[in-house]
Every structure is written in C-alpha cells, then in structure tokens.
Amino acid sequence: MNSKNHHQKKRFGQHWLVNKKILEKIKEIAVLNQNDFILEIGPGKGALTSKLLDSEIKKLHAIELDKDLINLLNDKFNNNDKFSLQQGDILTVNLDSINKKITKVIANIPYNITGPILDIFIGRLGITRNYNYEKIIFLMQKDVVDRILSKEGSPNAGALSVRMQLLSKIKKICDVPPSSFSPPPKVFSSLVVFEPIKNHLRLDISIEKNIDKLLRISFNSRRKMLRNTLNSILSNEEINELSESSKVCFNLRPQDISIEQWIKLAENCIKIKK
C-alpha cells in the first residue's frame, strides 16, 4: 500500500507526527546507543521509526494496531535487520518475551488510551514491575501532562500526579502545537520523558498500597476536607491520632497535601491499624 493512499482512522485516534523538528527532538532526548532495545508503540507510516533506525541501536520492535499499515511498514523496513514488527493492540498484547530486553519505550499516544498506557508502562502503586525500562518518551495530551506534573496547592493536583511522581522522575521537554500532526488534533500535546524509579528504590509495597487507597478515597470527593472523606475508613479518634502523628491538618482538601505528607499518612495509618 502506498502511504499516500492510507487515511487515518478516527477509531484508532491516529494523528501522525509530521513536524521534523519534533521528530529530531525525540531522537535527541532518547540518547540512543548500541545496546538499546527500543519499543515503539504505534509507528504509523514510520516517520519516527526511520529516525530511530538511523541510530546505532541494537533493536527496534514496533507494535501497530492498524492492519492496513503492516504491509506498508514491512515494505519500508524489511531490509533492516534491527527492525521487527508486530500487529496488535498495545493494551492487550503480551510483551513477556521481550519485556526484560526493552531499554526505552517511545510513543505518540492516542489520547483515548492515555490512562491505560500509563498504567502499563509507568506502573501502579503497590505493584512491582517486571521490567527495567531506562526511559519512556511519550508525546501526549498537554493537559494530562500538566496534571501529572502538578504540585500540591494547584487546582490540577490529583491522584494521578501523586502516583506518577512516586513511580518515576518526570521532565516535560516542550509543548507541541496541533499543526505538528496530520490531521491536527483539537488540543496541544507535550513531549515528556519518564524515568521509572527502580523497584529497589521505591517505597515499601505496603506503604504504596496504603497511599493508593488514601488517594482513591480522598480524591473521589476532592472538594471535601480529609476529615470528611477518611471517616469512611477511620474513627474520629484514629483521625485525630493520624493527624497528630503525621503533622497533617485534616481540614485541608486532598489537592493541598504534598507527596511527603501522603507518605507520612500512609506510614502512620499502617501503625494505627496494627
């Protein structure tokens, strides 16, 4: 199939990156080397794939959902020994055979699957990862990136920001306008780099699980004070004890609590419930 004859499919959320400067920027921040095993999610017509394969990498494995693009990609890259292609849905595909080989993940994420993609590749609190990615480079919706990077006191602060910041080091590289894509989306995107925190450097799994539980309960009613949300799992006596031992005011709303305070709350909650 000629690439010019392929039209994007709305159901796949296809907005292909065509801005050459951003394509080059992704390659630059990936800091590729001869030991890198790259996983590219949704290569589309292969614009970024070409850039990445032009580097001294060990392997690039691409996963593409759109069956109509498979022959196009194979025709384009089948003479490159570093390239392999798999047709499938990244949300359900089994990566067990290559997961421990992958060093870097690169993707222009369809907006409609951002949440599940973050769960799979950045991870979830209380669950040990079975991979060791050095770097994850995502081009994703700007307002989601802004929420992820939010600090306490910001109206954008939420469970997502606490979870992502506990699981990885995050750096926003730049914002990307709709005109950088074909067809242009309705919103701005951001280029962001995640460096997952190694399992042995993460918090104790029991603490992570407690943080996740506290976040879920608190942010389900984000306009309420902590005192009025956590009373579903704690008595008034326990709330007062937890507030005092953690040095956290329970008259605050969840978006005003810092990550360090969430950690203290989880640690002391475990002690109180023993």
Curated annotation (Swiss-Prot):
Its EC number is 2.1.1.182. GO terms for cellular component: cytosol. Pfam families: RrnaAD. PROSITE patterns: RRNA_A_DIMETH, SAM_RNA_A_N6_MT. Keywords: Cytoplasm, Methyltransferase, RNA-binding, rRNA processing, S-adenosyl-L-methionine, Transferase. It comes from the Bacteria. The keyword rRNA processing applies. S-adenosyl-L-methionine binds at residues 15, 17, 42, 64, 89, 108. One of its GO terms (molecular function) is RNA binding. It is found in: Cytoplasm. It is an enzyme of class 2 (transferase). It catalyses: adenosine(1518)/adenosine(1519) in 16S rRNA + 4 S-adenosyl-L-methionine = N(6)-dimethyladenosine(1518)/N(6)-dimethyladenosine(1519) in 16S rRNA + 4 S-adenosyl-L-homocysteine + 4 H(+). Belongs to the class I-like SAM-binding methyltransferase superfamily. rRNA adenine N(6)-methyltransferase family. RsmA subfamily. Specifically dimethylates two adjacent adenosines (A1518 and A1519) in the loop of a conserved hairpin near the 3'-end of 16S rRNA in the 30S particle. May play a critical role in biogenesis of 30S subunits. This is Ribosomal RNA small subunit methyltransferase A. It comes from Prochlorococcus marinus (strain AS9601).
